[in-house]
Amino acid sequence: QARGFRGFDATCPLVTKVHVEVAKLHKEGYEFIMIGHKGHPEVEGTMGQLPSGIHLVEDADDVQKVEPAQTQKLAVVTQTTLSVDDAADIMNAVKQRFPQVREPKQQDICYATQNRQDAIKLLSPQVDVVIVVGSPTSSNSNRLRDVAAKYGTPSYMVDHASELKPEWLVGKRTIGLTAGASAPDILVQQVIARLRELGAVSVRTLAGIQETIKFPLPKGLRQIGRAHV
């Protein structure tokens, strides 16, 4: 501010939804169980909404260690980029131990994360190797690689086309390619181009769910955009 810079809140609306829900229910006297990964920025951001009364669980075993001050008002929220299957297992453990727990009205896991995980479940059995385009620090990209591995399909993650290693493709006839929710399309196209250089002869897109949800730009950016039209 001292240098005249402007800040814009570009937090994903799906993450903001979790923050709003936590703040609202906290005022009503609720404690929380949060399903997520310790140290993940989103988890730290959500837990940072409250001074206390929010318990992080990373797996079903952690659920048994939770000791809330009271159980009459207990709610559960999740990190938006979790593995759908892992989150479901942990949620079942939460409901088994705390049958009265309040669940989100709509699931917290990002629709783009879920769509990609559903797609990789269909893709993995059909290919010899899976390449995931995404950052090694991206939770949802790592989950895609994990899902492929559960199907016994060798899987690798690259942040850039230059990271592709030819030895990954030796003896492989069919290559599956997917990308994390925040990976820009240009990176995917660059990986495809590199695969062609390494011998790929055709590219086929599998039918999947068409994502039509669009979120508006942050308010300040919308105003700037209109000013330049």
Question: What residues fall within each predicted segment?
Answer:
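The feature marks the mature, well-folded catalytic cores of soluble enzymes
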Residues: 1-179, 185-226
